[in-house]
């Protein structure tokens, strides 16, 4: 509720001299008989007063003027009794809502739009007569209390209506708060008036005072200064606020002041063109987003860059909120159609594009062009973590109930249990054809052969000195969780690429996780078939970060695993990164992941159709896939053949729209030699490297960084993805510099052992004691010294 006093402004100069305390009321009445149209609009637009009313004299303002007032910040119209006849005109002709019209009756203005439902004439006070003392008197007279100490309960909120704390006020503290324009309260512990921030420095600028509906509690709206309201140095006495738009605005304001010169945020602040481009990019991604999680994610991205533009231009969220409030009050509204250029663009997108699907061409000597071609999309890790962390923590703390809630929320399926235990019911194999079984069996067997060959044949033993035998032997990781992307996609290949090596390594417990289908709550029969073949204990019917958390921490029905493996979207990757760094989880992962990618090296003799097919097999994964062709001494004719083949084949693919967008940011890099091409590939470190060059096998020795290499014209990436035997779970985003693809050793750990005889101790003991002494670790030294002394290998008085 606002206070039952309404300052009447008949000239703007008087407002300017008394604004500091008059604005605390939170409402004003503009005198339409004294102010002209421009003055009314100027005040309504520029002054930050929550409620602006206008006394409307008959016939002074035109209909257009009245609509302009109501559409630009004037909340309601006060009509004197003698002018009441214009009310019908306002409602019926101008479409003004009745609750925005206040009509006088017997000296009282009855109103349903402002919070107070009526104002008597004596409560409407000319701004020229309004003093601090009068305002204090009105406030104190309005509020009441039944407390024995006479104090008034006071809720303190910030300008965004977020609660900072609950305090108490006395008549004297209210008077002082209005006098100083600061947050002033009554301290019950000290039994005295409390000027907030007087000792702590965490003061408050008082913006508005109001009462509740019964006038037995006050609300102070303040602008909090420095670290916060609470003595514990949090913004609120109820803890820190959640990260939201207000928190992001605060963070960006801070970064505007102290962001490092080379940071990405500083680049955004200093480069308006880059910032505008990111806003357009994120807006486009939001229009293309599907599903609740993706739409909310893309919207958050757009909000980030939009807020960066606001902060850069000294525009606050409060300014935006005021604008929204003003728009909410509009009487006449435009139809809401998009601007013509965007309508035209939308129509153009609805029509099938007819332009050629071609890659960009850049020469290796063009350093900037190469840098752009080899750059990968920026991954907003910290922003993703803000979304993922609460999901992980909720599943960790609440187990199955949280997991089921997220499955219903994100996958649209309400399940009674989050797991499908082995042996798997026959109904889950329905729809699985014999042809598919044969294809999966062949793939499983080939992957098994290749990964079984990787098992060490015997324990590694090395005698480093006579009597010193060192050994290393593998042991399987006991429990592994294998994430299989699913939902609308069917990816049995990922299931077998992870499940078979786990079985070969003899992991004791294999757990699959895959999001259920929205249609029936099941996973695809192909995935269930692979799970049965590799001896999986169960399939967790969940996806995303929640599935990773369930396996990493365990729930009532899901065992805690020791390692989580498998590809996924950015949320899955973020969850894997989180759990591997949490000592409470004690869970490792296979590798980080990014968008899928391929780099093809081709020379003049390469088959253009083969090259195009390899590029397109990667491009159809998604618009963010990375597709690069490095050409060695390619002629203009060969380049055109490849471009034509890309276009012709792409137009035959069901996912041509995705391919078109991917190829639009893909590149052909022209090199002069094989070594230069391999050097460029090593720098990029692709997930998939395809060598369509003469004598391809001779150049494999030059490959330093790649997830997997496909050698020769008849080795498409597709074979490695499904059936050749190598693993398709590979490092992306340049991580091939540090990580291997999934292999048998991925599912093992290696333990070392040493067996030292007295002869061996004699050979290395003095060296051990020497180094231990230098490091100041006498216990280490003594463990050797005691043994050697008892063996008579050193004198008893040896120091």
UniProtKB/Swiss-Prot annotation:
Pfam families: Histidinol_dh (PF00815), PRA-CH (PF01502), PRA-PH (PF01503). Residues 313-799 are annotated as: Histidinol dehydrogenase. Gene3D superfamilies: 1.20.5.1300, MazG-like, Nitrogenase molybdenum iron protein domain, Phosphoribosyl-AMP cyclohydrolase. GO terms for biological process: L-histidine biosynthetic process. Pathway: Amino-acid biosynthesis; L-histidine biosynthesis; L-histidine from 5-phospho-alpha-D-ribose 1-diphosphate: step 2/9; Amino-acid biosynthesis; L-histidine biosynthesis; L-histidine from 5-phospho-alpha-D-ribose 1-diphosphate: step 3/9; Amino-acid biosynthesis; L-histidine biosynthesis; L-histidine from 5-phospho-alpha-D-ribose 1-diphosphate: step 9/9. It catalyses: 1-(5-phospho-beta-D-ribosyl)-5'-AMP + H2O = 1-(5-phospho-beta-D-ribosyl)-5-[(5-phospho-beta-D-ribosylamino)methylideneamino]imidazole-4-carboxamide; 1-(5-phospho-beta-D-ribosyl)-ATP + H2O = 1-(5-phospho-beta-D-ribosyl)-5'-AMP + diphosphate + H(+); L-histidinol + 2 NAD(+) + H2O = L-histidine + 2 NADH + 3 H(+). The keyword Amino-acid biosynthesis applies. Zn(2+) binds at residues 618, 621, 721, 780. Disulfide bonds: none annotated. GO terms for cellular component: cytosol. Residues 230-312 are annotated as: Phosphoribosyl-ATP pyrophosphohydrolase. PROSITE patterns: HISOL_DEHYDROGENASE (PS00611). CDD domains: Histidinol_dh (cd06572), NTP-PPase_His4 (cd11546). Binds 1 zinc ion. InterPro entries: Ald_DH/histidinol_DH (IPR016161), HisE (IPR008179), Histidine_synth_trifunct (IPR016298), Histidinol_DH_CS (IPR001692), Hstdl_DH (IPR012131), PRib-ATP_PPHydrolase-like (IPR021130), PRib_AMP_CycHydrolase_dom (IPR002496), PRib_AMP_CycHydrolase_sf (IPR038019). Keywords: Amino-acid biosynthesis, ATP-binding, Histidine biosynthesis, Hydrolase, Metal-binding, Multifunctional enzyme, NAD, Nucleotide-binding, Oxidoreductase, Zinc. The active site is at 687, 688. GO terms for molecular function: ATP binding; histidinol dehydrogenase activity; metal ion binding; NAD binding; phosphoribosyl-AMP cyclohydrolase activity; phosphoribosyl-ATP diphosphatase activity. Its EC number is 3.5.4.19, 3.6.1.31, 1.1.1.23. Residues 1-229 are annotated as: Phosphoribosyl-AMP cyclohydrolase. Its cofactor is Zn(2+). In the C-terminal section; belongs to the histidinol dehydrogenase family. This is Histidine biosynthesis trifunctional protein. It comes from Saccharomyces bayanus (Yeast).
